[in-house]
């Protein structure tokens, strides 16, 4: 099937990132990166972009996170120790996309756990995350808890568990990452 990348700034069928020296100030994604124009690329207002998201027309979104709970709660808009945050479009994506995948490092830069039993950071979306992909593991949050699906080469279940703030359910068909 065909994948069309959507930018909440008002682009559908986003092209690849522009090469240095080829930047066009009119082709910028929601992250502020310059894009290359591609055939079929379309432009619209951010209002229409958010209508697509809120209307359930986005199949999959990939978001970063500060914390994810074992039940799939997402916290990605504010770090309480900073006292400020900006929720941006993540709340709309968490609520409007059919599937939410979180891609993040397994721990923060201070080695604090980011996958927790219950989020203690402000919640962006409740029970919205369907898959967590980190540098150490792939996990699936469920109402019964966190299922460990894949583990990074060279890491044991015990080692990954020691840097995770929620207990795993370990299925009999646990796989190693294929890099």
Where is each model-derived feature located?
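Conserved phosphate- and dinucleotide-binding cores of soluble alpha/beta proteins
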Residues: 13-179
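N-terminal low-complexity or amphipathic/hydrophobic leaders
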Residues: 1-16
